[in-house]
Amino acid sequence: MRTKWFVFFAIAVTLIVFGRLVETPSLSKSAVVLGIGIDYDESEETFEVSTQAVLVGSSSGDTSQTSFVCTSAKGGTIAGALDVIARKMGLIISLSHCNVVFVSTAALKLDHMQLVYPLTGMYAWSEQTIFVTGNKSPSEMLSLRIGTTISSPFFLQQALVNEEGSDGMIRTTAKDFLARSLSRSKSNVIPYIVA
């Protein structure tokens, strides 16, 4: 009986100590990504990944300054390109608030697990992220100013969520995209944005 309590106490102490030692980065050290663009160059076999991130910085007094930054990088994998972006920015990338993923038609021809799994497994990507494609490259789509907002991913997310079903508008989340890709038919429908 005493050994059971000792083991329980040792586990509790270990969890408390290591829970205090793990550093949680502040918002000023993180790049909160709102939208990500994935393009694939078939000739070089590289991914070009673009992100639109919100950078929160402090300014004079108690006010904080927010800016939107678009950054692109190439890599052999999506995770490799995101690592290059993190080094360029000097910040930790967080995809937990990513609203929209712009995927080029060349990237859609690849294995869909190769597109989705690195983001969900390594970067805590939300399953409710919306997939879209369009007539422009993903980096151009991210840098566009659409509607009345500064952030095109935020505007598109609001439009697709609020207007779903009207005028034939559809919304395909990352969860739906992967489920349909792994189904027997292996067919997907995602919104095509013309800007």
Q: Where are the regions that the model predicts?
A:
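Membrane-proximal alpha-helical signals and transmembrane carboxylates
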Residues: M1-A195
